[in-house]
């Protein structure tokens, strides 16, 4: 069962899982997913969620900010990372609905060439620099390109350090 797999991952010292509804055939706020999220929280597993549009199903979004807000209303104690700064082409909605959520982080995966430096700065400041994690989504984005995007923002050196490594250290308990 999925619960046995989660327990095995936790026993092995894994830090989390990634879920991608487009490829795993679920919507983030489906009732059948709630016990899975809860068990991840109990086991201390971080849940990374693909969010927003995916090229495999561009007209059928499986995770967005509204769905994640409904999930957060039903579960507590689960650490979520909502990928792609809140969702591919859904970042502004995520900023409105998820900024300030206690157990939610955002990552920079697949942002290079898609989000301007000004918009990235605005999103980081809305979420809080302590809630953003460096990620590339390689091979879709080269880590160097994401790094160049972050470097081209008006974020402070301290905010950039948080994004590049301090936040991950804190989230992962390193």
Region annotations inferred by a language model:
Residues 1-55, 59, 114:
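Active-site gating/metal-coordination segments in enzymes
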Residues 4-14, 34-43, 70-75, 94-101, ...:
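Acidic (Asp/Glu)-rich catalytic clusters
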Residues 9, 17, 40, 84, ...:
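Conserved, mostly hydrophobic/aromatic
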Residues 15-19, 47-49, 80-83, 104-108, ...:
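Hydrophobic faces of well-ordered beta-strands that scaffold small-molecule active sites
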Residues 22, 52, 86, 109, ...:
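Flexible loop residues that form catalytic
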Residues 59-67, 90-99, 116-125, 140-152:
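Histidine/acidic-residue-rich catalytic or RNA/ligand-binding cores of hydrolases
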Residues 85-88, 99-103, 109-114:
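Domain-core and long-helix interface of multi-subunit machines
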Residues 126-133, 141-174:
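Mid-to-C-terminal alpha-helical segments outside catalytic/metal-binding sites
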């Amino acid at each position: 069962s999925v619960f046995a797999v989660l327990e095995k991952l936790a026993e092995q010292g894994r830090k989390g899982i990634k879920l991608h509804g487009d490829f795993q055939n679920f919507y983030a706020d489906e009732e059948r997913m709630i016990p899975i999220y809860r068990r991840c929280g109990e086991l201390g597993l971080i849940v990374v969620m693909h969010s927003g549009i995916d090229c495999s199903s561009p007209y059928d979004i499986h995770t967005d900010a509204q769905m994640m807000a409904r999930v957060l209303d039903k579960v507590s104690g689960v650490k979520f990372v909502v990928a792609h700064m809140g969702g591919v082409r859904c970042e502004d909605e995520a900023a409105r609905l998820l900024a300030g959520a206690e157990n939610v982080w955002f990552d920079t995966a697949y942002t290079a060439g898609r989000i301007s430096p000004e918009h990235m700065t605005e999103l980081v400041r809305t979420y809080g620099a302590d809630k953003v994690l460096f990620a590339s989504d390689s091979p879709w984005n080269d880590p160097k390109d994401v790094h160049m995007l972050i470097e081209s923002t008006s974020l402070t050196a301290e905010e950039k350090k948080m994004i590049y490594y301090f936040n991950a250290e804190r989230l992962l308990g390193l």
